[in-house]
């Protein structure tokens, strides 16, 4: 009896150990990847000069141009500490990785946007002041250059070969913790995110936090298959949804920046929307798919080729268009000046149309990037919101002569109380046209606190007036 108990115990122990070893054997070992790549992943810190007003200042100081004799004269009669606003350094952190042994580094556009100085720190703690060779907002890719040689370069893979469920690994500097390693799996491929139409993101559940941006995403072969770019979160922290830029797209952008200082993208010239189940039925489709053409822009490649409103684009250069979000990346990476084969559904019949692809009119790239005031969002504390400029092309497409776009609403605040929404385009304040960020600043500074003011905003549904009451904060 005692022997049987011992036998049963030994059998159970053997099964437990066997299962443990089999589970352990089935898990990937990331140590080799980390060891081989650690010298090629860098920490990036930026410094930005921002105005700093004196908290003891009792009265507003006129904003004279730098070096103005009026400004110097005015300051002579002010008490100490009430002169022109001083400036302080604002710092932020990110990651990047070396793509050539002579010092070229890849990172995100948003990591270095607006930077006055960029410092790159290697794994051995060596630091370099980096030059921003170029930065492309549309793809969120930036290229840096440091004065160094014989640097270790990472290997590049092919993100097209990735499979959903495959293990991936990220290395970066979340919250400044250098060379932190996290792992997860590929959750989906070809994701489209708002305002990032030209990037088919790789979605993963790898833990990504502030500071990881710009760092590499590896496959199990130790090859870079993406650049960690952003997360989806309702709290600001990691919630299991991370997005990376495919490495092929990033390297294509980087090469264009290095060679020409700008990025060229294909342009079709249509406004599209998703095909719903009800629309699919009306078009004689067995299931909803494709991109429905809602508008064909005048003199565009699509117009010249004969594309029409109501056409459903179901294929582009041999690749299926399952969702409307699939089309912009396909068009964007097509070759300018060459014919593209566009498969459409028209009058319940499928047909092929050749379209000569033109270059996207709006260039979001800035070679030898230098921040401009007009590029940066402007905030109105009294109105409780921040706005950004519209490009000429955006104004043209929206058929607007003026306007600035709302990108952030303070909660609570005047804008929230007035019912203003992110994405609203403000074209008029207090019966004055808003043509630029400068107009927005000038008009809002002259508003009376507590007095209701009319704003004209443009929404997809059309223009609407809203009343807002500036708050004295």
Language-model segments: residues:
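Glycine-biased strand-turn-strand hairpin within the trypsin-fold
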Residues: 27-32, 37-105, 113-115, 126-127, ...
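Bacterial N-terminal signal peptides
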Residues: 10-20
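Short, conserved beta-turn/loop elements at beta-strand boundaries and strand-helix junctions
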Residues: 101, 135-139, 190-194, 275-277, ...
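Active-site loop architecture of trypsin-fold serine endopeptidases
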Residues: 29-30, 47-57, 89, 115-118, ...
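Active-site substrate-binding loop(s) of clan PA
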Residues: 31-33, 121, 131-133, 150-177, ...
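Short, acidic, Ser/Thr-enriched surface-loop or helix-capping motifs
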Residues: 93, 99-100, 122, 127, ...
